[in-house]
């Protein structure tokens, strides 16, 4: 069963529907840049689950050595799109609607 986790950026919140497969996905599967990948590894993160379970906000990534704004943007964007691509096609539209509502872009 999926577990819903909300992670916020500076001004945008994202929902992650975590399942066992996504939790155990290695960052190598996301095609991150060498800088972003190395920064996460040095901080002790090797899987999506390890990262999502230990941060409340993407801005926390900036505290990691060599993980500046560009890396934070890349990591957060790739996580969002990777998770989205793993959803079944029938769940994708509802997911986007839920994210828009969470951010106040769509009425409840």
What are these regions (language model features)?
Residues 2-108:
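Compact, charge-rich alpha-helical regulatory domains located at protein termini
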């Amino acid at each position: 069963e999926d577990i819903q986790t909300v992670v916020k950026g500076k001004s945008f919140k994202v929902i992650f529907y975590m399942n066992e497969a996504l939790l155990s996905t290695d960052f190598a599967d996301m095609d991150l840049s060498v800088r972003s990948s190395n920064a996460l590894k040095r901080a002790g993160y090797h899987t999506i689950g390890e990262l999502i379970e230990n941060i409340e906000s993407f801005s926390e990534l900036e505290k990691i050595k060599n993980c500046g704004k560009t890396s934070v943007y890349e990591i957060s964007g790739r996580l969002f799109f990777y998770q989205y691509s793993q959803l079944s096609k029938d769940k994708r539209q509802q997911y986007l609607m839920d994210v828009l509502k969470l951010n106040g872009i769509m009425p409840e």
